[in-house]
C-alpha cells in the first residue's frame, strides 16, 4: 500500500512539473477577501487574455506589490467585489490567484459569466512576454481544461476581440494569435 501511495505522489508531482504551473494563492500574496462571490459554471467555452497596462514586475515581491495595488484599485476605486481577473501572471513566471477557480470575474463586460480571465502584469504595448510567462499561461490553460473549468476545445480571445480596448497589448496580441485555441 505504501508503494502505491508513493507512486501516486510521484505521478502527481510529475504532472505538476509537466504543466509548469505554480499558483501563488491569494492568501500567500496577502490579498484581501472578496466582499461577495458569484459562482462561475464549469466547462466554459472561452478564456479571455488581458494585460493590466500598469507596471511590469520581474520578482515575486514586486509582483505582490502590483497585485495589491490592482486589487485596491478594483475594490476601493471601482467598487468591485475583488480583483477583476481569475488569475494573473507576473514577469517572474508565477501565476497568481485573483478570484480563482469557479468564481465569476469582472474582466470583460458581457463575457464574465462565460469565460475565465487571465491577465499579465504589465503593459504589453511596451513590455515583452518572457518564455516563463508563456509557459505559465499555457500551463494554466491546460490546468483549466484538466479541472473542467474550460472545455478542451475552448476559444481563446484577446480582450480587444470582446471589448473596445487595446488590451492585451500588441506584444501579447501577436503571441496569442499563434496559440492553437485562439480564434479570429
Curated annotation (Swiss-Prot):
Residue pairs linked by disulfide bridges in the UniProt entry: 57-63
Location(s) in or outside the cell: Secreted
GO BP field: innate immune response; negative regulation of biosynthetic process of antibacterial peptides active against Gram-negative bacteria; negative regulation of peptidoglycan recognition protein signaling pathway; peptidoglycan catabolic process; Toll receptor ligand protein activation cascade
Signal peptide: 1-20
Domain (N-acetylmuramoyl-L-alanine amidase): residue spans on this chain: 45-169
Record's keyword terms, sorted: Disulfide bond, Hydrolase, Immunity, Innate immunity, Metal-binding, Secreted, Signal, Zinc
Single GO MF descriptor: N-acetylmuramoyl-L-alanine amidase activity
Binding site for Zn(2+): 50, 159, 167
Pfam families, per database record: Amidase_2
Top-level EC class: hydrolase
EC numbers, comma separated: 3.5.1.28
Keyword tRNA-binding: no
Domain of life: Eukaryota
Needed co-factor(s): Zn(2+)
Catalytic activity entry: Hydrolyzes the link between N-acetylmuramoyl residues and L-amino acid residues in certain cell-wall glycopeptides
Site description Important for catalytic activity, residues in chain: 85
InterPro entries found in the cross-reference section: Amidase/PGRP_sf, Amidase_domain, Peptidoglycan_recognition, PGRP, PGRP_domain_met/bac
GO cellular component entries: extracellular region
Family recorded in the similarity comment: Belongs to the N-acetylmuramoyl-L-alanine amidase 2 family.
Annotated function: N-acetylmuramyl-L-alanine amidase involved in innate immunity by degrading bacterial peptidoglycans (PGN). Probably plays a scavenger role by digesting biologically active PGN into biologically inactive fragments. Has no direct bacteriolytic activity.
Protein's name according to its UniProt entry: Peptidoglycan-recognition protein SC2
This protein's encoding gene: PGRP-SC2
Amino acid at each position: 500500500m505504501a508503494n502505491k501511495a508513493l507512486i501516486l505522489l510521484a505521478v502527481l508531482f510529475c504532472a505538476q512539473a509537466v504543466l509548469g504551473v505554480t499558483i501563488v494563492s491569494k492568501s500567500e500574496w496577502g490579498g484581501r477577501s472578496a466582499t461577495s462571490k458569484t459562482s462561475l459554471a464549469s466547462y466554459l467555452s472561452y478564456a479571455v487574455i488581458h494585460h493590466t497596462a500598469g507596471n511590469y514586475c520581474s520578482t515575486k515581491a514586486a509582483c505582490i506589490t502590483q497585485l495589491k495595488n490592482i486589487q485596491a484599485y478594483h475594490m476601493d476605486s471601482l467598487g468591485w467585489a475583488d480583483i477583476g481577473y481569475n488569475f494573473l501572471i507576473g514577469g517572474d513566471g508565477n501565476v497568481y490567484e485573483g478570484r480563482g477557480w469557479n468564481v465569476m470575474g469582472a474582466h470583460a463586460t458581457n463575457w464574465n459569466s462565460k469565460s475565465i480571465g487571465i491577465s499579465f502584469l504589465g503593459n504589453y504595448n511596451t513590455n515583452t512576454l518572457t518564455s516563463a510567462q508563456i509557459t505559465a499561461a499555457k500551463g494554466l490553460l491546460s490546468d483549466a481544461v484538466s479541472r473542467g473549468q474550460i472545455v478542451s476545445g475552448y476559444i481563446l480571445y484577446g480582450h480587444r476581440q470582446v471589448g473596445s480596448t487595446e488590451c492585451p497589448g500588441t506584444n501579447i496580441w501577436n503571441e496569442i494569435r499563434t496559440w492553437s485555441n485562439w480564434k479570429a
